[in-house]
């Protein structure tokens, strides 16, 4: 592991957030991803590999502690995996919100509205807030924000 970052709503002071911690783990290039994935699954995490629509990332994986039989999460931690040479827009977005309280307030209000609208439908909730996230990530990139926290 090269680096670990806490990002997401719980990393932003005053932000409305579910009790979920998002952790970004940056892996060294030479790591064997199959071995890493096996270590995580042996520790009780579920591994989800997903394609990157932007084609800027590779080896995108998330790890979560499995849901219980009745569909309730046991723990609220998502571990996002990236290789060290991959862009990290989620860090730029979180940094921008920490530095711009007015944008953080607007995002918090949007999240609250969408949570009421979509309830436990995570996919629709994520899709509905994506325009906001993309807009402020672009602003962070244009403003020359640092790549890391």
Task: Identify the function of each model-found stretch.
Residues 1-6, 10-18, 27-37, 41-149:
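Catalytic core of pol beta-like nucleotidyltransferases
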């Amino acid at each position: 592991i090269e680096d670990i970052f806490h990002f997401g709503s719980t990393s932003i002071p005053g932000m409305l957030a579910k009790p979920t911690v998002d952790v970004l783990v940056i892996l060294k290039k030479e790591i064997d991803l199959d071995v890493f994935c096996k270590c995580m699954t042996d520790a009780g995490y579920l591994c989800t590999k997903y394609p990157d629509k932007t084609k800027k990332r590779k080896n995108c994986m998330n790890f979560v502690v499995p849901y219980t039989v009745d569909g309730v999460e046991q723990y609220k931690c998502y571990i996002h995996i990236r290789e060290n040479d991959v862009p990290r827009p989620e860090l730029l977005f979180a940094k921008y919100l920490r530095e711009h309280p007015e944008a953080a307030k607007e995002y918090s209000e949007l999240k609250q509205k969408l949570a009421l609208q979509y309830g436990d439908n995570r996919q629709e909730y994520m899709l509905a807030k994506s325009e906001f996230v993309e807009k402020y990530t672009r602003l962070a990139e244009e403003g020359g924000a640092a790549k890391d926290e």
